[in-house]
C-alpha cells in the first residue's frame, strides 16, 4: 500500500472532475476506474500466477458441466489487484500513508464478496471511497470498495489497515513446522498442502499489468524501486488450491467450484521486502464446509491459508478463501 503514484491530472472543461492519464477519475471523495478487461489480460493474470482453473481458459470453459457463463471469467485476484492499485490513486493517499506510518499500521485486510462474474469485454466501474481514519478504540483506516457493471454488482467489500493482524491463524495451526524450506514442494500433511513458488519481479509486473495497473508505479530498476504489491503473493494461493484439489482427485469439469469470498490479511512491510528468487511457501488447508450457509442453498467451503517467504519463514499473509459449488449459483441477493 506504500506505492507512490504520481497522478498526471487533466480537467475537462466545466466537468469539475479530475483524472490521470491512466484512466483513474477522482469523483468527490472517491477514485473510479472505468473500462474493461480483455482475454489477453486474463491470460497474463493466469500465466503470471500459474492459475490453471478451466473457468479462465479460453477453450476449456466450454467443458465445465452446467456452466451458465457465456465465456471465460476474469480472475478474482485480478479484480482485487485493481482495487489495491485504485486505493493508491486516491487523492488523500499521501496523508493515509503518513497516518499509517505514524500509527504503525503494518497490516492491510482485504475482505471481498464475489456477487457475480465478470467476463472479458464487459465494461465495468471499480470505485474506492476515501479512507476513514480513526484513532479510537484502535488506530485504523477503512476503505469501501465496489466493482459493478451497468446492471449488476460484481465485487463488494472493504479494505482496512490496522497495527495488528485480525486473523489468529499461525503456522502452529497447520500441519507444518519451521523451517518450511526443508519440506518438499507439493507435500500433503494432516489436511494441509504446501506449494512452493518463487518471487519474481517479472511475474509481479505482469500480474499488475493484467489488473490494468502501471507496473512502473511499483517497480523501476533505474530508480532502485522494488515494491511487490500486497496481493501478488496471496494470488498464488489459487495455484496452491488447484494443485491440492488435483492431488486429491478432484474433477474440475464435473464438480466445478467458484469463489464466494476472500478474507486476506497482508503484512505490507514484509511483502515490500520481498526480492526476486526468494522462496514463497503457500500453505492451504483442505476446504471444509462452513457451518453457516449464509443463505446459500448448499454449504460453502472454507480453506484457510498462510503465506510465508524466505529461509527465515517471514509471515506475508493469512487468508480464508470461501468457495461454493457452481450448482449453487447465483448466490442469494445477487439479483
Model-identified regions with their sequence ranges:
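Hot-dog-fold acyl-thioester-processing enzymes
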Residues: 2-105, 166-263, 324-335
Amino acid at each position: 500500500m506504500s506505492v507512490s503514484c504520481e497522478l498526471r491530472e487533466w480537467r475537462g472543461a466545466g466537468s469539475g472532475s479530475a483524472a490521470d492519464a491512466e484512466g483513474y477519475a477522482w469523483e468527490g471523495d472517491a477514485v473510479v476506474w472505468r473500462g474493461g478487461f480483455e482475454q489477453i489480460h486474463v491470460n497474463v493474470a493466469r500465466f503470471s500466477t500459474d492459475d490453471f482453473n478451466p473457468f479462465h481458459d479460453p477453450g476449456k470453459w466450454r467443458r465445465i458441466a452446467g456452466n451458465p457463463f457465456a465465456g471465460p471469467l476474469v480472475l478474482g485476484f485480478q479484480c482485487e489487484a485493481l482495487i489495491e492499485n485504485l486505493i493508491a490513486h486516491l487523492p488523500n493517499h499521501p496523508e493515509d500513508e503518513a497516518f499509517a506510518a505514524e500509527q504503525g499500521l503494518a497490516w492491510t485486510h482485504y475482505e471481498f464478496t464475489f456477487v457475480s462474474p465478470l467476463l472479458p469485454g464487459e465494461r465495468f466501474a471499480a470505485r474506492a471511497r476515501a479512507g476513514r481514519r480513526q484513532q479510537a478504540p484502535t488506530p485504523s483506516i477503512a476503505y469501501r470498495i465496489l466493482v459493478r457493471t451497468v446492471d449488476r454488482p460484481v465485487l463488494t467489500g472493504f479494505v482496512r489497515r490496522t497495527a495488528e493482524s485480525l486473523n489468529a491463524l499461525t503456522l502452529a495451526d497447520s500441519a507444518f513446522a519451521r523451517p518450511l524450506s526443508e519440506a518438499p514442494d507439493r507435500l500433503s500433511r494432516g489436511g494441509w498442502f504446501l506449494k512452493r513458488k518463487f518471487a519474481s519481479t517479472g511475474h509481479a509486473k505482469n500480474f499488475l499489468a493484467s489488473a490494468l495497473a502501471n507496473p512502473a508505479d511499483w517497480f523501476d530498476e533505474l530508480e532502485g524501486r522494488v515494491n511487490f504489491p500486497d496481493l501478488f503473493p496471496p494470488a498464488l494461493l489459487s495455484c496452491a488450491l488447484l494443485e491440492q484439489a488435483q492431488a486429491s482427485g478432484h474433477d474440475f469439469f464435473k464438480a466445478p467450484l467458484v469463489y464466494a469470498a476472500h478474507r486476506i490479511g497482508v503484512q505490507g512491510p514484509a511483502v515490500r521486502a520481498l526480492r526476486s528468487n526468494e522462496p514463497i511457501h503457500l500453505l492451504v488447508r483442505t476446504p471444509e464446509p462452513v457451518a453457516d450457509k449464509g443463505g446459500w442453498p448448499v454449504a460453502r467451503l472454507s480453506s484457510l491459508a498462510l503465506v510465508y517467504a524466505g529461509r527465515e519463514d517471514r509471515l506475508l499473509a493469512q487468508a480464508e478463501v470461501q468457495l461454493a459449488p457452481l450448482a449453487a449459483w447465483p448466490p442469494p441477493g445477487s439479483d
